[in-house]
């Protein structure tokens, strides 16, 4: 998962892949990630300074399923596990995870083990929270202030601030001071590059729920 390769580890992994690409035969690396922008940023194959510059790769994009496709996906999965699950449960899972294949796979496996829808949701939110906190930790290496502002912007958008003005107002209210447009622009742009948000909306409903739980920090 590309989300786990933020920070110094990313360069080590890219160096290892580049070495294997040059010297090893019949070896394939598969990198996955729900944050498409982060995956592209990690590979960075168009940057001459990247260890993977110029290396061939093939990209497979798996889009969201429709509600019907999600339900059929879950039914087949439960059938393979020889588990009987009611249509109401299948519909609930399909609607909650909004057709995202990775979450549907996780949800099906967790429900098969626990038979508890609330546990399914909590497990997914905890995973999303862990990935968001990892992003914040990376930002904290640059500046605790920057990290705090990322948290605030994510929480503001998760709680309904769906325009530039509303996000800026929410950020300034929490900071207790005026924030320059360039600061917010950089944060929004980076979150969009990571495929976390677009047009002040979360692309992934689970990330939205996780971001609502981000804690406020005292100044």
Residue positions per predicted region:
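Non-catalytic, well-ordered alpha-helical scaffold segments
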Residues: 11, 15, 33, 91, ...
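Helix-loop-helix "sensor" segment of P-loop NTPases
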Residues: 42-95
């Amino acid at each position: 998962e590309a989300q786990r390769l933020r920070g110094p580890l990313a360069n080590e992994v890219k160096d290892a892949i580049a070495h294997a690409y040059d010297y090893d035969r019949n070896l394939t690396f598969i990198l996955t990630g729900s944050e498409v922008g982060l995956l592209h940023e990690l590979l960075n194959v168009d940057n001459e300074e990247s260890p993977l510059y110029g290396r061939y790769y093939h990209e497979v994009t798996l889009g969201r399923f429709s509600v019907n496709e999600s339900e059929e996906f879950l039914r087949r999965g439960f059938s393979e596990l020889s588990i009987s699950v009611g249509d109401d449960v299948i519909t609930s899972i399909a609607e909650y995870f909004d057709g995202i294949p990775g979450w549907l796979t996780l949800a099906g496996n967790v429900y098969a083990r626990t038979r508890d829808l609330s546990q399914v949701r909590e497990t997914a939110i905890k995973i999303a929270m862990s990935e968001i906190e990892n992003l914040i930790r990376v930002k904290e290496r640059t500046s605790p202030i920057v990290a705090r502002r990322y948290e605030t912007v994510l929480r503001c958008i998760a709680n309904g601030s769906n325009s530039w003005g509303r996000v800026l107002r929410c950020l300034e209210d929490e900071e207790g001071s005026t924030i320059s447009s360039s600061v917010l622009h950089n944060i929004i742009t980076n979150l969009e590059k990571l495929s976390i948000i677009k047009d002040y909306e979360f692309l992934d409903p689970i990330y939205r729920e996780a971001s609502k739980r981000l804690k406020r920090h005292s100044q």
